[in-house]
Amino acid sequence: MYEKPSAPRPVGGVIDDAIKLYRESFRRCAPIGVLGAMVSTAFDLMVIELAHREGLPLTSLEALVRVYQEPPVMALNLLQIVLLLALFGALIVTQNAVSNGEPEPLVIQALGVGFARLGRCVIAAVISMVLILVGCLLIVPGIYLSGILSLWPIAMYVDDAGAIQSLDASRRIIRGNWWHASTVLAVAMLIALAFSMFAGFVAGVIQLVSGAGAAGQSMVQIIGAAANVFLLPMLPAAMIALANDVKQRQRLAGAPR
């Protein structure tokens, strides 16, 4: 059972807390994860349909790049990202309630918060991405900014901060704990990546056995959608566990000695 830390936790302890929070909150997050999987699957199917209509086989990287450069696909991809940002916020709201031992919010309530704050979420996401990309031109600043700004969604969906305020809140939360926070998030992303690669491997094996026909492609889509239901709540759980740990570190650092 997940409990907020009463003392600073090592990296492994925070990951363990994140896993506990993920498991405890999964039942509540599953409907939101299903919606996210539906959004991603719908986008994939539209890309496949467009490729077939244009006579572009999706058997090479070059063909795939050409399809994704089509204006309709680019517009649909932006729409997918915006919708997933709202669902990401809804997952944070739901998992934060679990971490605080609060009554279970209805799915519609969590979605309402996710979409109500979508405007400021998009602004914060764009600003943070621009800052990180510009910083990446000098390598080190980009790496630093990717860590120091990583908890802005928590500030926005837990503390109801604005777009700029959430970025500043993330900076203040992580300041002094950059290595710790970056390591936790890196481990969490590696776990999610490993799960995604495993699901892709299973889908590839099934498609190899079933062939490249409609049945094989349908099985791949089903496996991908099912994997997304489990995958989408992973990072929010890690971010909440990390935020709770870092806040505890700051409280102890500011306590009188």
Positions of predicted regions on the chain:
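Interfacial transmembrane-helix boundary/kink motif in multi-pass membrane proteins
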Residues: 29, 104-125, 169
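Selective recognition of hydrophobic, aromatic-rich stretches within alpha-helical transmembrane segments
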Residues: 1-6, 66-102, 129-168, 215-250
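Membrane-helix interface segments in multi-pass membrane proteins
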Residues: 40-81, 106-115, 136, 142, ...
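Residue-level signature of the transmembrane alpha-helical core
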Residues: 30, 34, 38, 78, ...
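Low-complexity, intrinsically disordered, cysteine-poor segments enriched in small/polar
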Residues: 14-17, 21, 74, 113, ...
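Nonpolar helix-loop interface/hinge motif
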Residues: 1-52, 142-212, 216, 250-252
